[in-house]
Amino acid sequence: MGATLRELSWQGRPLISGFGRRDLPFGYQGAVLAPWPNRLANGRYRFGDKELQVPLTEPERLNALHGLVAFAPWKVTTTEPESVTLTHRIWPQRGYPHLLDLTAHYRLGEHGLTFTLTAVNAGDTAAPYGGSFHPYLVAGAGSVDDWTLQVTAERYLRVDPDRLLPVELAPVAQAGYDFRAPTSLAGVTVDHAFTDLDFDDAGAATLRLLGPNGRGVAMSWDRSCPWLQLCIPNEHNPTMNRKAVAVEPMTCPPDAFNSGVDLIVLPPGGTHELSLTISPLD
């Protein structure tokens, strides 16, 4: 279901919050997100000369959340001892009248697990597109409050408190979301997108999540994702309450189908690829 990453561990130590083979995932655990990540206000947008409406999948906030494929059936096309490839076709449908072919590829290597998502516009009209991946990272046993997080992002996206839709960009230091140095997550509540990320000479941005013993997990991603969503589940989600951190590199911010910010428009035959790696820290 959904080409979802269900479990990932290193030497018996979980690197993500997983779930059982017969269980439903919590809050998009390990999901592939396309053709848009995050929230689309009212499920409504304009593309070209058409006003379009997709179903509301977060009805309590009047949003369409995380695209169309997170709970769709994908086809396993190739398997190797260290890799698997899955594919899914988005057929033209209500609110998204486009034909997209998606390929999700997972590969285990010496640096960890690398995930690649490729989108190809198989239709004959241009298509709006955004993508992301939604694992919940864990730095060991215990609570998020015992961990530290580091990611170099200069600005975050303020959201309205009721619908969690974008309001404006602000410096991270203005709201206690400055993780440019290793920062304790004790008492921190966050469900925001970050940008102005620091990409190194190899073109990678990196987030590090460490437990009190100095062990943890890292995620690195390429320039195809200039945005990062961070979310710490709270008491409203008792099964995951402060037990993991959702880390979601995104090609675009929330509601990009309306704002146009970093929105990808795939021409017929056009291709987009994003890639990230989850690695253990010892």
Identify what each model region corresponds to.
Residues M1, H88-A141:
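Acidic, contiguous internal or C-terminal segments within carbohydrate-active enzymes
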Residues T4, N63-T77, T148, L185-S259:
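Acidic/His-leaning functional-site neighborhoods
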Residues Y45-Q53, L117, V265-L281:
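Short Pro-Gly-centered flexible turn/kink motifs
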Residues R46-K50, V76-V84, R107-G112, A141, ...:
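A short, structured loop/turn motif at beta-sheet edges
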Residues W74, T103-H105, D196, V261-L266:
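Beta-strand-rich interaction surfaces with strong enrichment in secreted/lumenal proteins
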